[in-house]
Every structure is written in structure tokens, then in C-alpha cells.
């Protein structure tokens, strides 16, 4: 166990110790293999002969979607000036699987008709860093991964029927809890949901119980309903850092979820350590107002087979010091690799 005193280096804290799963590990991205282009390609774009089903049209100052020839399955249109999508933009490529439109000028009113729902094989749709004010749709049932980050979204349309939708990225928007609650109820395959950097003051109701990863950091959440997380029987990774959580808004067993492996409550207003299940492995509580270390927050009882599985614990930026830690902490946290205190 490495128990030490660390200065509060904010630039270093922002994720240095985190073991959150890398979202991009879930996908094997086709890489941009620029070189000689396939003849079956839009003249302004690049379709590598070694990867003829991919068309790269990044950073070309395009104002509209170019002609997309049949056979293209992976289409990259990043960092352009595209401000509209016509209804027939993809009629030659109904087997398109990935459509990447990040860093353009798209608005909802200029995305015509059922341009996306016609793509019956589409699995990945990214429209990050655009000018959307609501989610796009209708969308095809084949969709697995939807990314709409860094827009101005305050309204979510219906996601009904999207039985394969597994990943949703909605961070850095203008969403409030009611907009989220109404939209996501029926997504039975959803495992990954990022709602960080929005405008929520409460936890949204009706989130799918299938979630494995839920990010709600950087909102204005101050209260957790009693047993809110109990129904998420598969939840493993939960972020609630940079909110307004205080002891009065956190019921005693809020985070006592047996499936939970990682919990981030850093940068809140907590004075006592919320109780967690013995299975939790990584717990981030830095920069709160914690006054003492209570072993019972980690171990209800102590014994040869009764101990916490905590590996990494962050307590720096609180009122807890190394000398104030109780002796039985070491027995409770016997498998910890790192405990960071002031």
C-alpha cells in the first residue's frame, strides 16, 4: 500500500489516476491510410486502395456532402463547413456503416427528411461539434453508437425502436433532466451514457437499467433520490464529480451497489464519506469537505474474509490527514495499492 502526502496539482489530477474504461477500446477504427486513391471515389476525397470501403473527406472546406459512390461503408467528413444534408445525399450507399460528421456547421433544420433512417446498415453516427439544438432523427434500428457532443442540444427526440443502441455521448450540451427522462426510457441495450457538462439539477428518471457506464459529472446535481442506483444491477462506472452534492442530499446507502467498480464523487461538498459496497475498487473523493475517515463507510464488519476491495482511494484536498487515519483502516483496506491524502 502506498500511503503518501501529495500536493494538490490540479493539472495532474484531471484523470491521472483514473481507470475509467476507454470508450474507444470498444471499436477497431479504420485508420486513414492516405496514398494512391481508388478510382471509385469522389475526386476531392481519398479512398485508399488498401481500404477501398473507406472514404476520407476531412479538412477540405466542403460546404455540402460530396458524391458518395457505391461500396463505401465508412465515410469521414470531419472539419469541413458542411451546413446541410439533402434527403438524397446517401442514396448510393445504403450499406453505409459509419458516418462521421464532426466539426461542421450542421443545424437541425438543414438535415432533410429521413436521410439517416434510410441507412439500414448504419452502426455509428457522429455529429460532434456542430450547431444542433436537438437530437437528430429518425434513426435506423441498426444504430449502435450515437455521438452528439459539443452542440447546443436542449431537446431529445424519441429513440423508440433503437434496439441496438449501446453507446450515447451527449456531453457538453444544454440538457436538463426532464428532456433526458422522456427520451431514453425504452433503450434496453444501452450500456454507455455520457451526460456530463450539461445543465441538470437532478438525476434524470427512467434511465435504462442496462447501463454499465454512467457519466453525470459537471452538472448542478445536489440531491440523490433514495435507492436511485439500486435498480442499476449492472452499473460498474459512475461519475458524479463537479456537482453540488452535500451530505443532506445523499441518503446513506445511495452508492451501496454490488456491481459498482469505480465511483467518482470528487469536487463536491461532502463532509462524510458515503458508504460503498465492499466490491468497489476505485473511489475518488478529492476536493470535498471531508472531516474524518469512517471505516464503516467501507467495511461493515472486519474479518479474514470481510474487507474492502478498494485498490485506489483519493482523499486529497480534504481535512483528512495521514495522522488522522484510524488504525483499523489498514485492515479494512488491506488490498489497496494507493491511498492519497494531504
Curated annotation (Swiss-Prot):
Signal peptide limits: 1-18
Tissue distribution of the protein: Cornea and other tissues.
Subcellular location: Secreted, Extracellular space, Extracellular matrix
Post-translational modification: Sulfated on tyrosine residue(s). Contains keratan sulfate.
The keyword Transmembrane helix is assigned to this record: no
GO molecular function, a single term: collagen binding
Highest taxon of source: Eukaryota
Name of the protein described by the UniProt record: Lumican
Disulfide bonds: 299-332
Glycosylated residues, chain numbering: 92, 131, 164, 256
InterPro entries recorded: Leu-rich_rpt, Leu-rich_rpt_4, Leu-rich_rpt_typical-subtyp, LRR_dom_sf, LRRNT, SLRP
Organismal lineage: Eukaryota, Metazoa, Chordata, Craniata, Vertebrata
Keywords: Disulfide bond, Extracellular matrix, Glycoprotein, Leucine-rich repeat, Phosphoprotein, Proteoglycan, Repeat, Secreted, Signal, Sulfation
GO cellular component, one term: extracellular space
Phosphoserine sites (modified residues): 308
LRR repeat extents: 71-92, 95-118, 121-141, 142-163, 164-185, 189-209, 210-231, 234-254, 259-280, 281-300, 309-330
Amino acid at each position: 500500500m502506498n500511503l503518501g502526502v501529495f500536493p494538490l496539482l490540479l493539472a495532474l489530477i484531471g484523470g491521472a489516476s483514473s481507470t475509467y474504461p476507454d470508450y474507444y477500446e470498444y471499436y477497431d477504427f479504420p485508420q486513414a491510410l492516405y496514398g494512391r486513391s481508388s478510382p471509385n471515389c469522389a475526386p476531392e476525397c481519398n479512398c485508399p486502395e488498401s481500404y477501398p470501403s473507406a472514404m476520407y473527406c476531412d479538412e477540405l472546406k466542403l460546404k455540402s456532402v460530396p458524391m458518395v459512390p457505391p461500396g463505401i461503408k465508412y465515410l469521414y467528413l470531419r472539419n469541413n463547413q458542411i451546413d446541410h444534408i439533402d434527403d438524397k445525399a446517401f442514396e448510393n450507399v445504403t450499406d453505409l456503416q459509419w458516418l462521421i460528421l464532426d466539426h461542421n456547421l450542421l443545424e437541425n433544420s438543414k438535415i432533410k427528411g429521413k436521410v439517416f433512417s434510410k441507412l439500414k446498415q448504419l452502426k455509428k453516427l457522429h455529429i460532434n461539434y456542430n450547431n444542433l439544438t436537438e437530437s437528430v432523427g429518425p434513426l435506423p434500428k441498426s444504430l449502435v453508437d450515437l455521438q452528439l457532443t459539443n452542440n447546443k442540444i436542449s431537446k431529445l427526440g424519441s429513440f423508440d425502436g433503437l434496439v441496438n443502441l449501446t453507446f450515447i455521448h451527449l456531453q457538453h450540451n444544454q440538457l436538463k433532466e426532464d428532456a433526458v427522462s422522456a427520451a431514453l426510457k425504452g433503450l434496453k441495450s444501452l450500456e454507455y451514457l455520457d451526460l456530463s457538462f450539461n445543465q441538470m439539477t437532478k438525476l434524470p428518471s427512467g434511465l435504462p437499467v442496462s447501463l454499465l457506464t454512467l457519466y453525470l459529472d459537471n452538472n448542478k446535481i445536489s440531491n440523490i433520490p433514495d435507492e436511485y442506483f439500486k435498480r442499476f444491477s449492472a452499473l460498474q462506472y459512475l461519475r458524479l464529480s463537479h456537482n453540488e452534492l452535500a451530505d443532506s442530499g445523499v441518503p446513506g446507502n445511495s452508492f451501496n451497489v454490488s456491481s459498482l467498480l469505480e465511483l467518482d464523487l470528487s469536487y463536491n461538498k461532502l463532509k462524510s464519506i458515503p458508504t460503498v459496497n465492499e466490491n468497489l475498487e476505485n473511489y475518488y473523493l478529492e476536493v470535498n469537505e471531508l472531516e474524518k475517515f469512517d471505516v464503516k463507510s467501507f467495511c461493515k464488519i472486519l474479518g479474514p474474509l470481510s474487507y474492502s476491495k478498494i485498490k485506489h482511494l483519493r482523499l486529497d484536498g480534504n481535512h483528512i490527514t495521514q495522522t488522522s487515519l484510524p488504525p483499523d483502516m489498514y485492515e479494512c483496506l488491506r488490498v489497496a495499492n494507493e491511498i492519497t491524502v494531504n
